[in-house]
Amino acid sequence: MSGIKKVVLAYSGGLDTSVILKWLAVTYNCEVVTLTADLGQEEDLDGVDDKAMRTGASRAYVEDLQEEFARDFIFPMMRAGAVYEGRYLLGTSIARPLIAKRLVEIARAEGAQAVAHGATGKGNDQVRFELAVNALAPDLRVIAPWREWDLRSRTQLNAFAEEHGIPISSSAKQYSMDRNMLHCSFEGGELEDPWNEPGPNSYVMAVPMEQAPDEAEYISIDFEHGNPVAVNGERLSPAALVKKLNSIGGRHGIGRLDMVENRFVGIKSRGVYETPGGTLIHIAHRDLEGICIDRETMHLRDAMLPRYAAAIYNGFWFAPEREAMQAMIDVSQQRVTGTVRLKLYKGNAWPVGRQSPNTLYCHDLATFEDCATYDHKDAAGFIKLQGLRIRGYKKG
């Protein structure tokens, strides 16, 4: 069909992508190669390659991409301080360009004519996958079965699976979940009513605040050029560091978010997110910037952040504007080296101390005590000049 002889499929091993695997082979009469990416989702991936092969794949890749994910995707985003709509730390969004990148690389190695994904026609992920492929390999076709087939319900998917001998899990999931080392998201079910409180099954990476310890914990995070490198003085690899902070933040109930967001496709959706380690990195990094980056550079970067965050959320990681913004951001991060001390208590994290060899904080200028460096009289001329523009503006 359409000259497609081989397709590379992003494969999780679940019902949807297992049905897609068989559907691709039957509908397109083609060879299907699968990619299962380990992004630190802490799922047991043993046997997922065997399941893919039994379902009809000609080859099954299961790849550990955790360090690349943390180093080349999470950390650049964290250096920018990216937050979508003022709240969301983009845990799902940032994973898609890496998966798409590997799909393209495997497609090239396998001589495939197309890649495929299991994202639905209502969500953002279809856009993210396909824009990434457009940027990296515009000659490859992208197949999105949810936009092509006639299967419209879970019952129909189960019937297709039974017809083709695909194993079906007996346990029904309460939520649609997506997890990687940075976060876990929950959608669907009772959450589709924005008035309903999330249930206990929406706690995976962080405990409810009521179950968090009754005593505060202090931790330190070290940064070099904007990247976190150590926790409590222990240097860790990027992936190990994120996981360490997930464990620390999670036990204090840190990083929970319940919000209604604006999808790129125009739909409002409710999501519940857990990002314990990412929240700690974000808070500490922002605080360290306060003593390392000058005012105008920081304000220029801050003005750009909504555009940067939207670029990631909307699927433009590989777009020239995101790369241009990243270049400016990374220049600003050259000075961001130092240590931040955080106090953690029942869902909250406060910076309580920071130090840097590149600090721009001057005690002699900031002190309320007598200071020979600063002459208070100089402020009068400064204020007078600043007032020229608005002088008389509101005069009756």
Curated annotation (Swiss-Prot):
Q: One MF term from GO for this chain?
A: ATP binding
Q: Give the matching Gene3D superfamilies.
A: Argininosuccinate synthetase, chain A, domain 2, HUPs, Single helix bin
What CDD domains does its record include? Answer: ASS
* GO BP terms in the entry: argininosuccinate metabolic process; L-arginine biosynthetic process; urea cycle
> Gene of origin?
argG
Q: What class of enzyme is it?
A: ligase
Query: What PANTHER family does the database record attribute to this sequence?
Result: ARGININOSUCCINATE SYNTHASE
Sections of the chain in a coiled coil: none
Respond yes or no to whether keyword Amino-acid biosynthesis is given for this record. Answer: yes
Which SUPFAM superfamilies is this protein grouped with? Adenine nucleotide alpha hydrolases-like, Argininosuccinate synthetase, C-terminal domain
Q: What is this protein called?
A: Argininosuccinate synthase
Where's it found, cell-wise?
Answer: Cytoplasm
Is-annotated flag, keyword Amino-acid biosynthesis?
A: yes
Q: Which residues bind ATP?
A: 10-18, 37, 118
**UniProt KW keywords:** Amino-acid biosynthesis, Arginine biosynthesis, ATP-binding, Cytoplasm, Ligase, Nucleotide-binding
Assembly notes: Homotetramer.
GO CC annotation: cytoplasm
The regions listed as transmembrane in this protein's record are none
Q: Which residues bind L-citrulline?
A: 88, 93, 124, 128, 176, 185, 261, 273
Q: In which pathway does it act?
A: Amino-acid biosynthesis; L-arginine biosynthesis; L-arginine from L-ornithine and carbamoyl phosphate: step 2/3
Enzyme Commission designation: 6.3.4.5
Per the similarity annotation, which family is this?
A: Belongs to the argininosuccinate synthase family. Type 1 subfamily.
From which domain of life does this come?
Bacteria
State the reactions this protein catalyses.
Answer: L-citrulline + L-aspartate + ATP = 2-(N(omega)-L-arginino)succinate + AMP + diphosphate + H(+)
Binding locations of L-aspartate: 120, 124-125
